[in-house]
């Protein structure tokens, strides 16, 4: 079934109910908002939008971390993963929130310490905190991608 939502980047749009993800604990810093839609701007784009369906002004640019950091594996205890019904990181869709500075998009960063994991079957999601202290909340995406290509 299609529903209409108001989005920050695209205005009003129709989405499938199957695009609505439930975050029972909200996202870090936004615990009051539990329902989000994962929106693709263009099929070819690696960037997606995680848009709150409850608050039009709450939207995040997200990207799979494997696209620029192949060996990225956050350290998350198995019992925390079970909270969204998965037992292994590979069982979920992993995304990281991207910050794109308006003055220079080449300086965009990703929050590698706070990955989002979504159970693809139940559409339950959670933002975790990686116990790996080498993960940064402001990992430079283009610098990391360049190192990976060397």
Curated annotation (Swiss-Prot):
Keywords: Bacterial flagellum biogenesis, Chaperone, Cytoplasm, Translation regulation. One of its GO terms (biological process) is bacterial-type flagellum assembly. One of its GO terms (cellular component) is cytoplasm. It comes from the Bacteria. Signal peptide: none annotated. InterPro entries: Flagellar_assembly_factor_FliW, Flagellar_assmbl_FliW_dom_sf. Pfam families: FliW. It is found in: Cytoplasm. Belongs to the FliW family. Acts as an anti-CsrA protein, binds CsrA and prevents it from repressing translation of its target genes, one of which is flagellin. Binds to flagellin and participates in the assembly of the flagellum. Interacts with translational regulator CsrA and flagellin(s). This is Flagellar assembly factor FliW. It comes from Leptospira borgpetersenii serovar Hardjo-bovis (strain L550). The lineage of its organism: Bacteria, Pseudomonadati, Spirochaetota, Spirochaetia, Leptospirales.
């Amino acid at each position: 079934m299609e529903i209409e939502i108001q989005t920050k980047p695209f205005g009003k749009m129709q989405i499938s109910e199957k695009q609505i993800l439930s975050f029972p604990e909200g996202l870090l810093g936004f615990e009051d908002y539990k329902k989000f839609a994962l929106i693709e701007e263009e099929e070819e784009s690696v960037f997606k939008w995680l848009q709150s369906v409850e608050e039009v002004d709450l939207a995040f640019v997200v990207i799979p971390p494997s696209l620029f950091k192949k060996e990225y594996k956050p350290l998350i205890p198995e019992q925390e993963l079970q909270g969204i019904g998965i037992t292994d990181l590979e069982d979920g869709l992993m995304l990281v929130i991207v910050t794109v500075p308006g003055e220079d998009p080449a300086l965009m960063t990703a929050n590698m310490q706070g990955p989002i994991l979504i159970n693809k079957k139940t559409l339950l999601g959670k933002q975790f905190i990686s116990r790996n202290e080498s993960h940064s909340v402001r990992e430079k995406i283009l610098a990391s991608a360049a190192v990976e290509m060397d």
